[in-house]
Amino acid sequence: MKFHVIVGRGATASKTALLLAEDGERVRMISRTGGGPDHRLVERVAADATDTDRLTELAEGADTLFTTAVPPYHAWPEQLPILSASLLTAVRRTGAAYVMLGNIYGYGPVDGPITPHFPLTATGPKGRARARAWEEAAASGVKVTEVRAGQFYGAGAFSVFSLLVQRPVLEGRLVLVPQELDVPHSYSAIDDTARTLVAASREEQAYGRAWHAPTATLSVRELARRLAELSGAPVPRLEEMTERDLTLLGITDPLWGEMHEVLTKPGHPLVLDFSETEKILGVGATPVDDVLRQLI
């Protein structure tokens, strides 16, 4: 029986664990709280993944080590390198294949559709931290691949849309959004991202490069309108937050202050090309309405 380790306990980690377990493969999930889904083939362990010796012990014998874990948003520049170094060391010691969940911050502002072959040219601290994690893993000689997702949406998502947009839309309230309302963005569903992680882990030609999770590309206004129509809520009222709004909110909550780097790129659509994922890994995007219906 194949054995995999997943570092993380969020929606993507849990869905990935269930996909593997439902195929009869054993999974050990590692997180500080020991969370994860209830399944006979899923073992949940409370441990700190930055404790490299403990992580190595828990990953011994694993065919694959998946990571979906990230530090608190405002602490990425300081803590993500520590976590990434621990994960990479554990992979080196155990010989497990390494599958990373990433995002698009490492690309920086890009014009036109982004392929996974684009250089990682971000200059901001969070973007550089993300890029460095992949660059160091790719240069290490281990068997590694990365799946980069857009902004998450749908059931289980933790994102700007899920935190700030979906509930006010469903309740018919004014929606304050810290990004441009009519600029296209690529959104990834949790299930599609998990399916891509599993598919990449099983495909030999997936290693040594990055892939894009399937996405739906539309503006936040369009996505909010679709959700309202499906749920029977009123036409959404959206208002774009200014940089000054974010600065003031950041005084009391560091999360808001951190959004400047990744959300205020005027006129820059964030559009991911995932055609290679469809063609080679065989994973496509779930229709937008099907993803949104999970929220109703």
Please identify what each model-predicted range represents.
Residues A131, G154-V165, A200-W211, A233:
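Glycine/proline-rich active-site loop of Rossmann-fold NAD(P)-dependent oxidoreductases
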Residues G35-T94, S201:
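NAD(P)H-binding glycine-rich loop region in Rossmannoid oxidoreductase-like domains
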Residues A85-R130, T145:
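Conserved Rossmann-fold NAD(P)-dependent oxidoreductase catalytic core, especially the SDR/UDP-sugar
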Residues E276-E278, G282-I296:
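Amphipathic terminal alpha-helices
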Residues A216, V220, A224-V271:
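Terminal hydrophobic/aromatic helix or amphipathic segment near a protein terminus
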Residues A13-S14:
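N-terminal Rossmann-fold NAD(P) dinucleotide-binding loop
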Residues N103, E135-G156:
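Conserved beta-loop-beta element that borders a ligand/cofactor-binding pocket
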Residues R167-S188, E204-Q205:
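A conserved pocket-lining segment of Rossmann-fold NAD(P)-dependent short-chain dehydrogenase/reductase
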